[in-house]
């Protein structure tokens, strides 16, 4: 039984029903419908913390999906899972791939900045101020790009940029 038929909560069930209706109405190929079904099942599994199942669905969606814009969101979600699992290098790779296909993903840039900031914090704990500055500068670059795409978002990042003197665009 597909995951989409196992949804227990009202919102997921409603979303699934609406998505199924739209898939029937909108003229798309069978391949596109299958890709969307795997993407939707991946999101459902991911929201329940079933990351292995989510990844299987996302990889299958990637195999089927040909639209770069749609692929960007699949790649972004794969990046989220790797971030949640603490696999930051892998997560960064997927965020980069998502941005290559869709440069208007401020959430990917924000997540990349958060990872770089975290690595900067780790460098502080390890007593390596030079490496810390490199990571913080990289985080600042990503946050500035994210903020330029979504100026009313990322208020904490905007404050951090001001406080650390990194708010000026290079």
UniProtKB/Swiss-Prot annotation:
Keywords: Chloroplast, Membrane, Photosynthesis, Plastid, Repeat, Thylakoid, TPR repeat. One of its GO terms (biological process) is photosynthesis. Gene3D superfamilies: Tetratricopeptide repeat domain. It comes from the Eukaryota. TPR repeats lie at residues 35-68, 72-105, 120-153. One of its GO terms (cellular component) is chloroplast thylakoid membrane. It is a peripheral membrane protein. It holds the Pfam family TPR_1. It is found in: Plastid, Chloroplast thylakoid membrane. Essential for the assembly of the photosystem I (PSI) complex. May act as a chaperone-like factor to guide the assembly of the PSI subunits. Belongs to the Ycf3 family. This is Photosystem I assembly protein Ycf3. It comes from Anthoceros angustus (Hornwort).
């Amino acid at each position: 039984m597909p995951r989409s038929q196992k949804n227990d909560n009202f919102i997921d069930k409603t979303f699934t029903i609406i998505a199924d209706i739209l898939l029937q109405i909108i003229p798309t190929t069978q391949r596109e419908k299958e890709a969307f079904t795997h993407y939707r099942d991946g999101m459902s599994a991911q929201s329940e913390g079933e990351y292995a199942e989510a990844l299987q669905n996302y990889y299958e969606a990637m195999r089927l999906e040909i639209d770069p814009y749609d692929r960007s969101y699949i790649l972004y979600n794969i990046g989220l899972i790797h971030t949640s699992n603490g696999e930051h290098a892998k997560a960064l790779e997927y965020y980069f791939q998502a941005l290559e296909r869709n440069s208007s993903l401020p959430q990917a840039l924000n997540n990349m900045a958060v990872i770089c900031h975290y690595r900067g914090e780790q460098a502080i704990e390890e007593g390596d101020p030079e490496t810390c500055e490199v990571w913080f500068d990289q985080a600042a670059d990503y946050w500035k790009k994210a903020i330029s795409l979504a100026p009313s978002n990322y208020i904490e990042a905007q404050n951090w940029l001001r406080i650390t003197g990194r708010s000026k665009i290079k």
